[in-house]
Swiss-Prot record:
Keyword ATP-binding attributed: no
Keyword Oxidoreductase among record annotations: yes
Quaternary assembly: Homodimer.
Cofactor info, note text: Binds 1 FAD per subunit.
UniProt name for this protein: Mercuric reductase
EC number(s) from the headed UniProt entry: 1.16.1.1
Additional information: The active site is a redox-active disulfide bond.
Disulfide bridge partners, by residue number: 134-139
One Pfam family hit: HMA
Molecular function, one GO term: mercury (II) reductase (NADP+) activity
Organism (species): Alcaligenes sp
Cofactor dependency: FAD
Length: 559
């Protein structure tokens, strides 16, 4: 049965209408779309249309019966509603293509949409908030907070203080948080919930999934009960959660992970940060710029896995802003007494009003019962996959942070898309040889390809050049010359194989380096390209030119 509905103004309206319709006797399930102004219902014979319109009218909207869509669309909808969401204890496809189960709703969305595009029917299972980590408690809110902190920093201090009077910004964290969360909600509705609501080939179950065997899942529904989902193919894309180190006293204290830090409506006067992960450094600087006195406890140096110059540059920038960076320092004990954290280290005690623990993320796989499906994981719980995202059980796939792939949302989405292609009969692999990475500190850190040490480890002879930003016109015009651009080439061929950059806009230049490496360009070919003058990406051209000339002796825009 189908209804046209007028008067709805948002996705929440559609949710209320759905709830009301599903309370009408005889209604098995309802799919309500605010953008389309429609409802699609699976009902028992004899269900009263008048009861349906009355239920909608009771919410202040108007509903009128509508013509059914095409036979194929109707069959797909009823197959979903009656077969997967009906009163039975089995959920499965209706025979019109493969039935794919997707566990997760963050980057897993890319896989679900690609599977539908390939002709499959999808059951998507999410135990938490639709959208996963990135949009809800990761990339999006953190970058909003970082941007707000950057604005606060520039008001307090900038290279133009001689002509623009500096001022101490008044920080209202509660208002910043409201602005941040409003954008998060907007993106979640637009890019996840709304898309799912409007796709009749995707059924969403809210609950926690575990494998019964290699062909079915048991889903403990959030609103009670359990449902069995049978599948032809399955994708595990459950992401990762903050890892907490086994420091005595830590678990008994009210510490923050990044999740709590991003939704805090207060700025602590003193913040201690355990860890030197990307998340630790981004949030440490953001809180410092919003008013906290920040101390970072780093087990080694910052960015110790990268070219040493990167860690040195960021450490210098942090210390210049008053952030304490304690290298080779670990907490052996954490106590929380009278509202104060006390961290015991080999160099004495550190006291703080709040403690952020950001030592990395662990795969969300412990509750999946992977062994029941014969799916192998490594010692850290990460699912082992091949280049086609297949697990040790070939018709079960995995992608993203729950695997041993690099923990970036764009890697997870790309892996999920390729998994969907493969599970529907295609052949796609994920090539990470030119994978960009960006850290949103200030200055930013961006890398792609080999560092010199990595190349030497793989037996590649290299040559390299490092261009400091005082040779880049954009940086000079900005009066901000912190950082450098380093190019690594294969000796002999001159082919570009790696780029490392520390610069305020490093993230905006790295994709050009990705394309150069992907297309096997030589450093001379890169130097010969036209780059817009007074852009930061022009620094790539200048760095390439340093292999054959002294750029200090060139005019500003020398070709």
């Amino acid at each position: 049965m189908y209804l046209n509905i007028t008067g709805m103004t948002c996705d929440s309206c559609a949710t209320h209408v759905k709830d009301a319709l599903e309370k009408v006797p005889g209604v098995l399930s309802a799919l309500v779309s605010y953008p389309k102004g429609s409802a699609q219902l699976a009902t028992d014979p004899g269900t009263s249309p008048e009861a349906l319109t009355a239920a909608v009218a009771g919410l202040g909207y108007k509903a009128t019966p509508a013509d059914a869509p095409s036979t194929s669309a109707r069959g797909r909808l009823l197959g979903k509603a009656l077969g997967w969401l009906g009163g039975g204890d089995k959920a499965g496809g209706d025979g019109d293509g493969l039935h794919v189960a997707v566990i997760g709703s963050g980057a897993a969305m890319a896989a679900a949409l690609k599977a539908v595009e390939q002709g499959a029917n999808v059951t998507l299972i999410e135990r938490g908030t639709i959208g996963g980590t990135c949009v809800n408690v990761g990339c999006v809110p953190s970058k909003i907070m970082i941007r707000a902190a950057h604005i606060a920093h520039l008001r307090r201090e900038s290279p133009f203080d001689g002509g623009i009077a500096a001022t101490v910004p008044a920080i209202d964290r509660s208002k910043l948080l409201a602005q941040q969360q409003a954008r998060v909600d907007e993106l979640r509705h637009a890019k996840y919930e709304g898309i799912l609501d409007d796709n009749p080939a995707i059924t969403v179950l809210h609950g926690e999934a575990r494998f019964k065997d290699d062909q079915s899942l048991a889903v403990r529904l959030n609103d009670g009960g359990e449902r069995v989902v049978a599948f032809d193919r399955c994708l595990v894309a459950t992401g990762a959660s903050p890892a907490v180190p086994p420091i005595p006293g830590l678990k008994e204290s009210p510490y923050w992970t990044s999740t709590e830090a991003l939704v805090s409506d207060t700025i602590p006067e003193r913040l201690a940060v355990i860890g030197s992960s990307v998340v630790a450094l981004e949030l440490a600087q953001a809180f410092a710029r919003l008013g906290s006195k920040v101390t970072i406890l780093a087990r080694s140096t910052l960015f110790f896995r990268e070219d040493p110059a990167i860690g040195e540059a960021v450490t210098a920038a942090f210390r210049a802003e008053g952030i304490k960076v304690l290298e080779y320092t670990q907490a052996s004990q954490v106590a929380h007494v009278d509202g104060e954290f006390v961290l015991t280290t080999g160099y004495g005690e550190i006291r703080a009003d709040q403690l952020l623990v950001a030592t990395g993320r662990a795969p969300n796989t412990r509750s999946l019962a992977l062994e029941a499906a014969g799916v192998a994981a490594n010692a850290q719980g990460a699912i082992v996959i091949d280049k086609g995202m297949r697990t040790s059980t070939p018709h079960i796939y995995a992608a993203g942070d729950c695997t041993d792939q690099p923990q970036f949302v764009y890697v997870a989405a790309a892996a999920g898309t390729r998994a969907a292609i493969n599970m529907t009969g295609g052949d796609a692999a994920l090539d990470l040889t030119a994978m960009p990475a960006v850290v949103f500190t200030d200055p930013q850190v961006a890398t792609v390809g080999y560092s010199e040490a990595e190349a030497h480890h793989d037996g590649i002879e290299t040559d390299s050049r490092t261009l400091t930003l005082d040779n880049v016109p954009r940086a000079l015009a900005n009066f901000d010359t912190r950082g450098f651009i380093k190019l690594v080439i294969e000796e002999g061929s001159g082919r570009l194989i790696g780029v490392q950059a520390v610069a305020p806009e490093a993230g905006e230049l790295i994709q050009t380096a990705v394309l150069a490496i992907r297309n096997r360009m030589t450093v001379q070919e890169l130097a010969d390209q036209l780059f817009p003058y007074l852009t930061m990406v022009e620094g790539l051209k200048l760095a390439a030119q340093t292999f054959s000339k002294d750029v200090k002796q060139l005019s500003c825009c020398a070709g």
